[in-house]
Amino acid sequence: MRGEANGEEEQQPPRRNHLRDDAEEEEEVERRAARPVSGQQQQQQRRRPTDVGGGAAMRSVGYVGKHRLSAAIARLDQELQSLQDELNELETMEPASAACQGVITSTEGKSDPLLPVTIGPENASWERWFQRVRSSRSNKWWASKGSDFS
């Protein structure tokens, strides 16, 4: 109380988020397991006092780790099964060349419906729009300016 009058606040212990702490502890355990332990680190680990609630946290970390491992194994089994099914399906299929040959023979005599049947334009009056203009005043004007339109 006296510190509050002087503008100082009481120091309270920080509140811990148990879900985040469990995840952080799990990551720390995984990091420790992943790297080799030197002799000096082993001595430091022996000297550290264990937390009072550390046993329960370690048990939950082990359970979560086991659950993750079993889920990963189940996912890999499922992927393996789907790949095996696909392989069996590919083994029973006929070669692609036979399928292509069937497509070629079925479409060989038929004309393409998207291509026009006539050789020239259907309407001859449309042809004039695609021809070059022979002479016009505007064309002569552009030619006098050094353009390439003539």
Swiss-Prot record:
Pfam families cross-referenced by the UniProt entry: G-gamma
One GO BP annotation of this record: G protein-coupled receptor signaling pathway
Top-level taxonomic group: Eukaryota
Residue stretches making up the G protein gamma domain: 71-137
Location within or outside the cell: Cell membrane
Residue ranges the record marks as coiled coil: 65-97
Composition skew (Acidic residues), residue ranges: 1-11
Any single Gene Ontology cellular-component annotation: plasma membrane
Keyword Cell membrane: yes
Record flagged with keyword Coiled coil: yes
Disordered, as annotated region: 1-59
UniProt keyword list: Cell membrane, Coiled coil, Membrane, Transducer
Purpose of the protein: Guanine nucleotide-binding proteins (G proteins) are involved as modulators or transducers in various transmembrane signaling systems.
Subunit architecture: G proteins are composed of 3 units, alpha, beta and gamma. Interacts with the beta subunit RGB1.
Name assigned to this protein: Guanine nucleotide-binding protein subunit gamma 2
Lineage, highest ranks first: Eukaryota, Viridiplantae, Streptophyta, Embryophyta, Tracheophyta
